[in-house]
Swiss-Prot record:
This is tRNA (adenine(58)-N(1))-methyltransferase catalytic subunit TRM61. It catalyses: adenosine(58) in tRNA + S-adenosyl-L-methionine = N(1)-methyladenosine(58) in tRNA + S-adenosyl-L-homocysteine + H(+). The lineage of its organism: Eukaryota, Fungi, Dikarya, Ascomycota, Saccharomycotina. Its EC number is 2.1.1.220. It is found in: Nucleus. Belongs to the class I-like SAM-binding methyltransferase superfamily. TRM61 family.
Length: 406
């Protein structure tokens, strides 16, 4: 079972979990009986975690005090794994990966090529969404680390991921028997049919890998490509290679994110402001009178003590929350929804270059005839063609105007 593609309700011994300690501090943990997970907020026994639902808050009393520390135990997801994984290379974060998968049209039927496995962040997101992932890594040590990680997470044997040690810029994407790969060849099988319709290139020189793609992309449907390039000079060379090898719909974008902070703000009416001014004036007048009485030093010591702190009833009027703690959304006040945007835009991670390609454009005769019949129902002026060579005749502008007027 893969912890990243399947879900369960309760935590069991041997599960891989992600422990949310604080914002930006997420740790991976393998649950083992008898062991203890130590943090600055306390020590948490694994036995106390087993059997609890995923997402539970686990609390312990801090030694030597009455304070409690707690953690949250979460089910692994690609988004949370991105926050906790060991960085072997620069990774693709969720704002970029989610947009890339949407632009590539990834689905459970997709067959994806990922060149540049790196730390495996994007590989986990692909594995959850697509039907088959072929990932390539040229650095042997990173390949071995990623392979061990994918096997531990159940993405190889029980999953849909194949990782290969290969320099795709020099040797291409074909996987053959004898290559260093996680793919298990059947008896008599000498190669793998990649047949990919989505390609993601996270390479220093993607323009060197583009010429090798025609041998492995799908022949019967559109293939979509994304190149992840930090420098604009890389983008320039990539565009030249895409145009040279027949790729179309070429576009380069960058993702820049700004966070909107939404909250409720107290509505301050004019009448409330006037009443507040009157209240301040009354308090000021009361203070002046009290100081005057103290200055005259009238009465006994006990009377002076009483005058220093006069017992006046606590006022219940507080239009702006002054003098008492008011929680956001308190029913005693009127609120409105407001939002504040970050003043600075977070800088981009890389340029994203998208393109698409169809190797062979073929149409089925029956499909075309059905489409023409459907179109005829909406436009009676078009005659349906029974064969591909029978196209609706073209008409001049004057003839079309005359037919429309009739």
């Amino acid at each position: 079972m893969s912890y990243f593609t399947e879900y369960k309700d309760l935590i069991a011994e041997g599960d891989l979990v992600l422990v949310w300690i604080s914002r930006g501090n997420v740790k991976q943990l393998r649950i083992k009986s008898g062991e203890v997970f130590n943090t600055r907020y306390g020590s948490f026994a694994h036995d106390d975690i087993v059997g609890r639902p995923y997402g539970s808050q686990i609390g312990v009393r801090t030694k030597g005090s009455n304070r409690f520390g707690f953690i949250h135990v979460l089910q692994p997801t690609p988004e949370l794994w991105t926050l906790s994984l060991p960085h072997r290379t620069q990774i693709v974060y969720t704002p970029d990966s989610s947009y890339i998968m949407q632009r590539l049209g990834c689905s459970p039927q997709s067959r994806v090529i990922e060149a540049g496995t790196g730390s495996g962040s994007f590989s986990h997101a692909f594995a959850r969404t697509v039907g088959q992932l072929f990932s390539y890594e040229f650095h042997h040590m990173r390949y071995e680390q990623a392979l061990a990680e994918f096997q531990e997470h159940g993405l190889i044997a029980d999953g849909n991921v194949t990782i290969t040690h290969r320099d795709v810029c020099q040797k291409g994407f074909l996987i053959k028997a004898g290559d260093t790969t996680s793919y298990e060849f059947l008896e008599g099988q000498d190669s793998v049919s990649v047949n990919a319709d989505c390609i993601f290139l996270d390479l220093p020189a993607p323009w060197e890998a583009i010429p090798h793609l025609d041998a492995v992309i799908a022949k019967d449907r559109t293939a979509r490509l994304c190149c992840f390039s930090p420098c604009i000079e890389q983008v320039d060379k990539t565009l030249e290679a895409l145009e040279l090898h027949g790729w179309e719909e070429i576009e380069t974008v960058e993702i820049q994110g700004r966070q909107y902070e939404s909250r409720r703000q107290m509505v301050r009416q004019l009448d409330d402001a006037l009443e507040r001014l009157r209240d301040v004036k009354r308090r000021k007048q009361h203070g002046t009178e009290r100081r005057k009485r103290l200055g005259e030093q009238l009465g006994s010591v006990e009377e002076l003590t009483d005058d220093v702190r006069p017992k006046t009833p606590k006022t219940s009027y507080n239009p702006f929350g002054k003098g008492s703690r008011v929680k956001e959304g308190d029913n005693g006040f009127e609120w409105k929804q407001v939002a504040k945007v970050e003043s600075e835009i977070k800088s981009h991670t890389s340029y994203l270059t998208f393109a698409s390609k169809i190797l062979f454009k073929s149409r089925d005769e029956n499909t075309v005839s059905q489409l023409l019949e459907q179109y005829k129902d909406f436009n009676p002026n078009v005659k349906a063609a029974s064969k591909l060579d029978k196209r609706p005749q073209e008409t001049s502008f004057e003839e079309s105007q005359a037919s429309n007027s009739v």
